[in-house]
Amino acid sequence: MFEPFFGFQKTPFQRDLPVTELFSTPAHEELISRLKYTVEKRFFSLITGEVGAGKSTALRRLDSMLNPNKYKVLYVSDSALTPRNFYGEVLRQMDCEPKFYRGDAKRQMHKAILNLVENQGRSPVILVDEAHLLSKEMLEEIRFLLNFRMDSYNPMSLILVGQPELKRILQLNIYEAITQRIGMRYHLVAMDMQEMADYIRHHLKVAGIASPLFTDGAQEILFEYSGGIARKVNNVCLSSLLCAAMRNKQLIDDHLVREVIENEFGT
């Protein structure tokens, strides 16, 4: 609706940007480097970050970088994940029909992973997104999941990704056996003010607009509200563009952004 008004070639601030068009901050680049190292060393790793900070986007980038002849990426995201469902999902992604009973499915998955590594020369990369929602039962199962050949061999990398509370959960004594196995930890921070300004400029440019549409004052209000969280920035920018187009305004100032935030986002 606002695209023709501003002259956009496509809608800006979308989540489904091609990997080649994604904006990256130094924090994102560090995360990608750490994830690649995790995969190379077959680590068990923990990635945390606030909602909308770009964790899942980083996983998309990682997936696009890995050679499919060397790695098999297995992505799991289920708020009600149980061990049986987990094994079933991983096995299906490995083109195996999962056994009905949990113990059988677990042994089946172990065999499938070893076959992938030893016979096909590919390393499994298991990505568990929204891991802060994992149940106690599922978290405890991870310890057994990582136990290959009496804990002397690790044929895969396992990456847990979730909100900051995941780190706090794993600090509980009952999960000490799990935390001792974590080979890499990283917390993805939000963008700072300059990074957010560059982020907005990047998304406008990718959508076909080279000129700035948001005043400095508008960006200051936006940063104050969003804290540099990409998803919040996207939402407010889209709503502000729509509001500006409806009012026949070519420039988005601090007054409009503040009004949009107050009326649409309740702050």
Task: Enumerate the language-model features and the residues they cover.
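Conserved AAA+ ATPase "SRH/arginine-finger" region at the nucleotide-binding site
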Residues: 76-79, 170, 183-196
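C-terminal alpha-helical "lid" subdomain
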Residues: 60, 155, 177, 194-267
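Mid-core helix/loop region of P-loop NTP-binding domains shared across ATPases and GTPases
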Residues: 82-85, 97-141, 150-154, 191-196, ...
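Short regulatory helix/loop adjacent to the ATP-binding pocket of P-loop NTPases
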Residues: 63-66, 166-181
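Walker A/P-loop nucleotide-binding motif
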Residues: 41-64
